[in-house]
């Protein structure tokens, strides 16, 4: 059969014509779909702007709060439970609804913004056990200012929730994470130290914060170290907490006896500590002791973790140590500390915080019972010191708590409380 006749026969075949038509339609639809996909990709690349924020970024929680503030009409929600501490000290539970994983649309400054919250089910954070998440913002246009404005608003919204409070951070892995809920700032006047001690430290810290240029002009590393030492319960940690509130700083808590703490991790944590924060190393004598004692008891000197003594020294003032840093250390036994740890440059200010004096006892009495006279406060101080000359601030506070509304009872029973 000639080829021309074969083609003519195919044209006259209705089944072939129908099949060829379907193939043509399918091909056209496929090409149209591919063209639409490429067109959408090109449109998004040239006429849309996208911002992705992973859950490890510090602004992630800020943005979730911001989204819940703007996406009030969304019907797909997740719940976040938090605790609130009231002025009275009472703690209540608060439930916040945030958009669940998926796509959400909000109207912001005359623009529609698509928000996609993704949750990876196959990957989790080993420290918290929570899945990895990310939030992606997509908007029309190429102006980045819209995302900058969103981040600024989210930050301001988060800061409003922390006004009048002190934020505590704890070292988790290679980063600092907020520990618990922000605490009400403790007034500096609520911690009564011996006359002049509080004022001396506050003046020194503020002078350090306000004069970075003085350090740079003289080539001095811009960092400051403090050591508060003395018997337990005398107000060392309480004063640091109140000082952070006075400066409107946060506190970064770090345990040197943490078994997972190594030299590299300590260096990294000190370098990424939140700005405007005090790094607090409590009970440093529990992690390291004097090298003289090391010869007698090498196991105790090594501590519980992988952190070495030389690693700690280098982190405090070595070549790789960071600047613009305030470190407070506390100890109950300064004699157990190696002189190399507390030399100038690593510890610039050493301050003894001891047992209560007559003046301290009088001031504490007047603070708990502001309506009482100076004569009654002196009577309380004299009675307390006559029974013992080693009274801690924690003991006095516990005694006052037993006589909240009975100042006379506090004076009469002080001997029993200090025995």
UniProtKB/Swiss-Prot annotation:
Residues 1-15 are mitochondrial intermembrane. InterPro entries: AAA+_ATPase (IPR003593), ATPase_AAA_core (IPR003959), ATPase_AAA_CS (IPR003960), BCS1_N (IPR014851), Mitochondrial_chaperone_BCS1 (IPR050747), P-loop_NTPase (IPR027417). It is found in: Mitochondrion inner membrane. It comes from the Eukaryota. ATP binds at residues 230-237. Residues 33-419 are mitochondrial matrix. Its main location: mitochondrion. GO terms for biological process: mitochondrial respiratory chain complex III assembly; protein insertion into mitochondrial inner membrane from matrix. It catalyses: ATP + H2O = ADP + phosphate + H(+). One of its GO terms (cellular component) is mitochondrial inner membrane. GO terms for molecular function: ATP binding; ATP hydrolysis activity. The chain crosses the membrane at residues 16-32. It is an enzyme of class 3 (hydrolase). Keywords: ATP-binding, Chaperone, Hydrolase, Membrane, Mitochondrion, Mitochondrion inner membrane, Nucleotide-binding, Transmembrane, Transmembrane helix. It is a single-pass membrane protein. Its EC number is 3.6.1.-. Belongs to the AAA ATPase family. BCS1 subfamily. Chaperone necessary for the incorporation of Rieske iron-sulfur protein uqcrfs1 into the mitochondrial respiratory chain complex III. This is Mitochondrial chaperone BCS1. The lineage of its organism: Eukaryota, Metazoa, Chordata, Craniata, Vertebrata.
């Amino acid at each position: 059969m000639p080829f021309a006749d074969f083609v003519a026969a195919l044209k006259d075949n209705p089944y072939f014509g129908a099949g060829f038509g379907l193939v043509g339609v399918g091909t056209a639809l496929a090409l149209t779909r591919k063209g639409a996909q490429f067109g959408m990709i090109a449109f998004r690349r040239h006429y849309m702007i996208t911002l992705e924020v992973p859950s490890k970024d510090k602004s992630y929680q800020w943005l979730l709060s911001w989204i819940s503030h703007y996406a009030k009409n969304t019907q797909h929600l997740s719940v976040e439970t938090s605790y609130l501490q009231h002025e009275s000290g009472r703690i209540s539970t608060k439930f916040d609804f945030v958009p669940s994983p998926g796509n959400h649309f909000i109207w912001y400054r005359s623009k529609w913004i698509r928000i996609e919250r993704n949750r990876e089910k196959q990957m989790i954070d080993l420290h918290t056990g929570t899945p990895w998440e990310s939030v992606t913002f997509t908007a029309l246009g190429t102006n980045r200012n819209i995302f900058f404005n969103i981040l600024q608003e989210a930050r301001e919204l988060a800061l409003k929730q922390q006004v009048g409070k002190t934020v505590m951070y704890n070292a988790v892995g290679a980063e600092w994470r907020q520990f618990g809920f922000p605490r009400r700032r403790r007034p500096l006047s609520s911690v009564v130290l011996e006359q002049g001690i509080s004022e001396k430290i506050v003046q020194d810290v503020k002078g350090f914060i306000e004069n970075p240029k003085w350090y740079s002009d003289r080539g001095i590393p811009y960092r400051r170290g403090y050591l508060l030492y003395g018997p337990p319960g005398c107000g060392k940690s309480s004063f640091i907490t109140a000082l952070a509130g006075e400066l409107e700083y946060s506190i970064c808590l770090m345990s040197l006896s943490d078994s997972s703490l190594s030299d590299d991790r300590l260096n990294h944590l000190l370098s990424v500590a939140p700005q405007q924060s005090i790094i607090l190393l409590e009970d440093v004598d529990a992690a390291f002791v004097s090298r003289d004692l090391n010869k007698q008891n090498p196991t105790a000197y090594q501590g519980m973790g992988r952190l070495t003594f030389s690693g700690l020294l280098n982190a405090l003032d070595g070549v790789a140590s960071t600047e613009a840093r305030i470190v407070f250390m506390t100890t109950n036994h300064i004699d157990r500390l190696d002189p190399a740890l507390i030399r100038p440059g690593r510890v610039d200010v050493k301050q003894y915080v001891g047992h209560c004096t007559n003046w301290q006892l009088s001031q504490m009495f007047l603070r708990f019972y502001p309506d009482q006279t100076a004569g009654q406060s002196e009577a309380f101080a004299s009675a307390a010191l006559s029974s013992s000359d080693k009274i801690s601030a924690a003991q006095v506070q516990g005694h006052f708590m037993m006589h909240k509304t009975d100042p006379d009872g506090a004076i009469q029973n002080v001997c029993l409380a200090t025995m």
